[in-house]
Amino acid sequence: MNNATFNYTNVNPISHIRGSVIITICVSFTVILTVFGYIAKIFTNKKNCTNNVIGLRERIKCSGCEPFCNKRDDISSPRTGVDIPSFILPGLNLSESTPN
């Protein structure tokens, strides 16, 4: 009944290395896309939000500045959390902001 034992020395190490490299590349690509998407969203929205973020409360609340607002009464404190860029998850609408 020795046939049930496995000999792990016959496993090809090249296939394990190749699998690890593929997984690492996929995870790195996802992280890079998330970071670049978040940075692009900040720069895109920041140019529309300079007057509101400074603290001019008389202006329309969160008109184009949803990522920088709490949507309560205080527009000076930033909202916490990380927004998922829309090009990574195109089918899900997880963001609170309205599309332009």
Swiss-Prot record:
<keyword id="KW-0946">Virion</keyword>
<comment type="similarity">
    <text>Belongs to the influenza viruses type B glycoprotein NB family.</text>
</comment>
<dbReference type="GO" id="GO:0033644">
    <property type="term" value="C:host cell membrane"/>
</dbReference>
<feature type="topological domain" description="Virion surface">
    <location>
        <begin position="1"/>
        <end position="18"/>
    </location>
</feature>
<keyword id="KW-0735">Signal-anchor</keyword>
<protein>
    <recommendedName>
        <fullName>Glycoprotein NB</fullName>
    </recommendedName>
</protein>
<keyword id="KW-0375">Hydrogen ion transport</keyword>
<comment type="subunit">
    <text>Dimer.</text>
</comment>
<keyword id="KW-0812">Transmembrane</keyword>
<keyword id="KW-0325">Glycoprotein</keyword>
<keyword id="KW-0813">Transport</keyword>
<dbReference type="GO" id="GO:1902600">
    <property type="term" value="P:proton transmembrane transport"/>
</dbReference>
<dbReference type="Pfam" id="PF04159">
    <property type="entry name" value="NB"/>
</dbReference>
<keyword id="KW-1182">Viral ion channel</keyword>
<feature type="topological domain" description="Intravirion">
    <location>
        <begin position="41"/>
        <end position="100"/>
    </location>
</feature>
<keyword id="KW-1133">Transmembrane helix</keyword>
<dbReference type="GO" id="GO:0015267">
    <property type="term" value="F:channel activity"/>
</dbReference>
<dbReference type="InterPro" id="IPR007288">
    <property type="entry name" value="InfluenzaB_glycoprotein_NB"/>
</dbReference>
<keyword id="KW-0407">Ion channel</keyword>
<keyword id="KW-0472">Membrane</keyword>
<comment type="function">
    <text>Putative viral proton channel. May play a role in virus entry.</text>
</comment>
<keyword id="KW-0406">Ion transport</keyword>
<dbReference type="GO" id="GO:0055036">
    <property type="term" value="C:virion membrane"/>
</dbReference>
<feature type="transmembrane region" description="Helical; Signal-anchor for type III membrane protein">
    <location>
        <begin position="19"/>
        <end position="40"/>
    </location>
</feature>
<dbReference type="GO" id="GO:0016020">
    <property type="term" value="C:membrane"/>
</dbReference>
<feature type="glycosylation site" description="N-linked (GlcNAc...) asparagine; by host">
    <location>
        <position position="7"/>
    </location>
</feature>
<feature type="glycosylation site" description="N-linked (GlcNAc...) asparagine; by host">
    <location>
        <position position="3"/>
    </location>
</feature>
